[in-house]
Amino acid sequence: MAIVGVPGWIGESAVNETGQRWMDAAMREVRVSVPGWMSSMAGQSKEIHYSIGASNSYNKDTLINWIKAQGSTPVVITITGNIVSQSTGVPCLDFPSSLTNAYVTLIINSGVTVYGRGGNGGSNAAGAAGGNAINNGIGTRLRITNNGAIAGGGGGGGGGNRGKLIFGGGGGRPFGAGGSSSHMSSGATAGTISAPGKGSVGEGSLSAYTGGAGGNVGAAGGRCNTQGNGTEYNGGAAGKAVTGNAPTWTKVGTIYGSRV
């Protein structure tokens, strides 16, 4: 909540916002110049707000660097559009233990999802694991209000072989790449923001043989199927929704994958 505007009971509102009864102390809490007029606090907040819009390849370091620049000041991060990690090797959002903020509030808006990236499908190999959505290194100082969803990336589908047939697994949701294949009637497909990819399908009379399907969010990829007549590899493991230390859950909301 911000301090009320003009006209309004700024003094009372400033006390409620900052917990400080001396106005010079309240001014410092909301980062306005001292000495100064009480009206300079109108609309100010003890917390600093930051919003993140939609991105299919979000770089976690962008947020980390901004949070660190605020020092010990509490911050409120609002996710306003779907965001997907740029790689399965890193979480979409990361709150490392080096952050010194009094607390970090994370608000995920309704209809919005924070995604780990989907794993790539295997090419005559196992599927890759999906990525994690959020890593928490600051414990209960991270306060999550999840009005939308938090989703680990789906695992990539497993590949395999049977004679000259090389099977590719489907990509995990979202955006896992499909594995390459040969002698197929249809190749493996990539995962999208809304669906996992499909495994490749054998040519001709071998159409019952398939690469593993990519995993949906929070789910492992499927195993290649050669009906026991070739080499079959497993799909990749599911990414996790929230890893690290348990946060303060103001609202858990919809979760795909494991969480702390």
Swiss-Prot record:
A motif (GRM 2) lies at residues 125-132. A motif (GRM 8) lies at residues 210-216. A motif (GRM 9) lies at residues 219-224. It is found in: Virion. InterPro entries: Gp38_N (IPR048291), Receptor-recog_Gp38 (IPR007932). A motif (GRM 4) lies at residues 162-173. Its main location: virion. A motif (GRM 5) lies at residues 176-182. A motif (GRM 1) lies at residues 116-123. Residues 180-191 have a biased composition (Low complexity). The record marks 9, 22, 37 as: Interaction with the fiber protein p37. GO terms for biological process: adhesion receptor-mediated virion attachment to host cell; symbiont entry into host cell. Residues 176-197 are annotated as: Disordered. It comes from the Viruses. Keywords: Host-virus interaction, Viral attachment to host cell, Viral tail fiber protein, Viral tail protein, Virion, Virus entry into host cell. GO terms for cellular component: virus tail, fiber. A motif (GRM 7) lies at residues 194-204. A motif (GRM 10) lies at residues 228-240. A motif (GRM 3) lies at residues 152-160. Belongs to the receptor-recognizing protein gp38 family. Receptor binding protein (RBP) that is at the tip of the long tail fibers and serves as the phage recognition site for the attachment host receptor OmpA. The N-terminus is involved in binding to the fiber protein p37. The C-terminus contains glycine-rich motifs (GRM) and mediates the host specificity. The glycine-rich motifs assemble into a 3-layered PG(II) sandwich domain. This phage use outer membrane protein ompA as a receptor. This is Receptor-recognizing protein gp38. It comes from Enterobacteria phage K3 (Bacteriophage K3). The gene is 38.
